[in-house]
């Protein structure tokens, strides 16, 4: 009988403490509208397949809710972010060489009533200066968003260049 009372008393105390522990609530503002780069919700690194040059990749900004008025978004390529990313994540990416990439339509707009922007276009125009064996990335970041706060972990997308290599090989599977 004593163990029955002890077990139920202990269970009651644990239940009471767990309820009291949740009364503070979290400090996160669920109604706050923030901007982020589309596709960075799970990882900031995204593959960008470059088969021939020029190759294009559309980068857009999204918001956590629809906007009431037009919001201007400014994108930029910031090569210095590659070293920062490498240090934080223990990776060995290389910034794409100067002159190998351009950013078109860097000034995008999230139109009123929508939650995504017009695209900025990243265009790889040359792979001539690429060294064999290196993994290159293009760090595209949101520099400025009018009237909205930028979600820091999703501020930059790293476009990992994946090159398609064509080669011929001997087919030894034919037994004729």
Regions found by a protein language model. Name each.
Residues 1-10:
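Bacterial N-terminal signal peptides that target proteins for export
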């Amino acid at each position: 009988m004593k163990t029955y009372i002890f077990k139920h008393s202990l269970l009651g105390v644990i239940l009471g403490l767990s309820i009291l522990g949740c009364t503070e609530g979290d400090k996160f503002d669920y109604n706050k509208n923030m901007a982020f780069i589309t596709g960075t919700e799970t990882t900031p690194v995204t593959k960008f397949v470059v088969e021939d040059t020029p190759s294009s990749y559309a980068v857009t900004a999204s918001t956590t809710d629809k906007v009431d008025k037009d919001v201007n978004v400014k994108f930029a390529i910031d090569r210095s972010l590659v070293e920062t990313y490498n240090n934080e994540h223990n990776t060995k990416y290389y910034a794409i060489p100067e002159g190998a990439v351009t950013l078109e339509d860097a000034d995008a707009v999230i139109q009123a009533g929508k939650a995504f922007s017009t695209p900025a276009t990243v265009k790889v125009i040359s792979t001539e200066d690429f060294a064999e064996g290196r993994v290159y990335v293009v760090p595209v970041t949101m520099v400025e968003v009018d009237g909205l706060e930028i979600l820091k972990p999703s501020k930059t997308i790293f476009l990992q260049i994946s090159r398609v290599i064509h080669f011929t090989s001997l087919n030894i599977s034919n037994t004729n």
